[in-house]
Curated annotation (Swiss-Prot):
Hydrolyzes a variety of simple alpha-D-galactoside as well as more complex molecules such as oligosaccharides and polysaccharides. The lineage of its organism: Eukaryota, Fungi, Dikarya, Ascomycota, Pezizomycotina. It is an enzyme of class 3 (hydrolase). PROSITE patterns: ALPHA_GALACTOSIDASE. GO terms for biological process: carbohydrate metabolic process. One of its GO terms (cellular component) is extracellular region. Pfam families: Melibiase_2, Melibiase_C. This is Probable alpha-galactosidase B. The active site is at residues 134, 226. Glycans are attached at residues 141, 159, 215, 265. GO terms for molecular function: alpha-galactosidase activity. InterPro entries: Aldolase_TIM (IPR013785), Glyco_hydro_27 (IPR002241), Glyco_hydro_27/36_CS (IPR000111), Glyco_hydro_b (IPR013780), Glycoside_hydrolase_SF (IPR017853), Melibiase_C (IPR041233). It comes from Aspergillus fumigatus (strain CBS 144.89 / FGSC A1163 / CEA10) (Neosartorya fumigata). Keywords: Disulfide bond, Glycoprotein, Glycosidase, Hydrolase, Secreted, Signal.
Length: 426
């Protein structure tokens, strides 16, 4: 995407989206309620800024016969999308919209394939700041010649491979030449041509080897199929995304899908682990729960200032990375047990972010050994044989844990995560 108009898109997006909370049951009132809650709950002050309308916002029967524009549903949006955009902008927030790189959206509404220029211009005139662009409704003449391996559970994924893929591309095939890549480039070109900066979020489910071309096409790109508010799905997506961290840096972010914090029957520990992993991976953090009924515990997770500072670091674009798998041998692809030990440098925290995950179904002890953490090895090496420690802060409580030598151990309940800032030597 063009980076010349503004600095927008340098850092991973923060916001809220209708889909995980409401599906198709949306209207202007629900969206403005969410926007006002982003302000009232203090989320705007923490950097959350996008209020995104997902699928089902338009008239389903078709486009305007004379202009060929998509028509906002007048029952859901009496003042149109532009009316909602004006109200959201008045709050100091930004607004997002949804379409698909096909003939219809995933819910069967008019989509943008073949209408990219018209829709980009329409979105710009309405004051849109963000486009989520899905992958539904693709006609046969736009179907790729080959099938790319996205090792989601449901396929017979073996250590990240897809032995059930009957139509793989030949060795050396350039997926930039695929029809999927072309469909997404067409909307990119249309967005760049309008006189408004619109963040471009590709939602192609990891297909067509998007990690090779996503960053030259959009600001973020989905790496998997859809998330659900269940720990097995969250763990599986975290596992898949953990192998893509070398693609993360300023201006380009693999997207493991929107947040489910506050949804379903996730335990508080699972909500914590979900958010901490997504923040540490510098994924877009798009809230997907009803904010007018959110619990204080869930709000506290979404509002964690230390994780958000790491996520929005203006100097270091690289994410945290796994440095030890823990439950499994290193580099094991396991949907039930993603990498458990992560670390990442920060210019704003005064130290290194370290995560320890308990991926097991029972309470377990996890131990971060300082000499194993890549960011700490240089400091330890300079000290020679002298035994030193580091100042450690608990990310969840903000508590100073003092000068911790050699390692830090903690008992973690099932699917919980310990998050630490390991600071200066002591």
């Amino acid at each position: 995407m063009s980076r010349s108009k503004t600095r927008q898109g340098k850092l991973p997006a923060l916001g809220w989206n209708t889909w995980n909370a409401f599906g198709c049951d949306i209207d202007a009132t629900k969206i403005m309620t969410a926007a006002n809650e982003v302000v009232n709950l203090g989320l705007k002050d923490l950097g959350y800024e996008y209020i995104n309308i997902d699928d089902c916002w338009s008239v389903k029967s078709g486009r305007d016969a004379s202009t060929q524009r998509i028509i906002p549903d007048p029952d859901k949006f009496p003042d149109g999308i532009s009316g909602v955009a004006d109200q959201i902008h008045d709050l100091g927030l930004k607004i997002g919209i949804y379409s698909s790189a096909g003939l219809t959206t995933c819910a069967g509404y008019p989509a943008s394939l073949g209408y990219e220029d018209i829709d980009a211009q329409t979105f710009a005139e309405w004051g849109i700041d963000y486009l989520k662009y899905d992958n539904c409704g693709v006609p046969s003449n736009w179907t790729d010649t080959y099938t790319y391996c996205v090792p989601d559970p449901g396929s017979k994924a073996t250590n990240g491979t897809c032995p059930d893929n009957k139509n793989p591309a030949p060795a050396g095939y350039d997926w930039r030449t695929s029809l999927t890549a072309e469909r997404y480039r067409r909307m990119r070109d249309a967005l760049v041509s309008v006189d408004r900066t619109i963040l471009y979020s590709l939602c192609e489910w990891g297909q067509a080897n998007v990690n090779d071309w996503g960053n030259e096409t959009g600001n973020s790109w989905r790496t998997t199929g859809d998330i659900t508010p269940s720990w097995p799905r969250i763990a599986a997506i975290a596992n898949e995304n953990s192998f893509l961290m070398n693609h993360v840096d300023f201006w380009g972010y693999p997207d493991p899908d929107m947040l489910e914090v506050g949804n379903g029957n996730l335990t508080l520990a699972e909500n914590r682990a979900h958010f901490a992993l997504w923040a540490a991976m510098k994924s877009p953090l798009i809230i997907g729960t009803a904010l007018d009924s959110i619990s204080q515990d869930h709000l506290a997770i979404l509002s964690n200032k230390i994780l958000l500072k790491f996520h929005q670091d203006p100097v270091i674009g690289r994410p945290a990375q796994p440095y030890k798998w823990g439950y499994n041998p290193d580099w094991t692809f396991d949907p039930a047990h993603p990498a458990e030990y992560w670390s990442g440098a920060s210019s704003v925290l005064g130290g290194t972010l370290v995560l320890m995950l308990n991926s097991e179904d029972t309470t377990q002890r996890r131990t971060a050994v300082w000499k194993e953490v890549p960011e700490l090895k240089d400091v330890l090496g300079r000290q020679g044989k002298r035994r030193i420690g580091f100042r450690v802060t608990d990310v969840w409580t903000g508590k100073d844990l003092g000068c911790v030598r050699d390692h830090y151990s903690v008992e973690l309940e099932s699917h919980d995560v310990a998050a630490l800032v390991v600071g200066r030597a002591c």
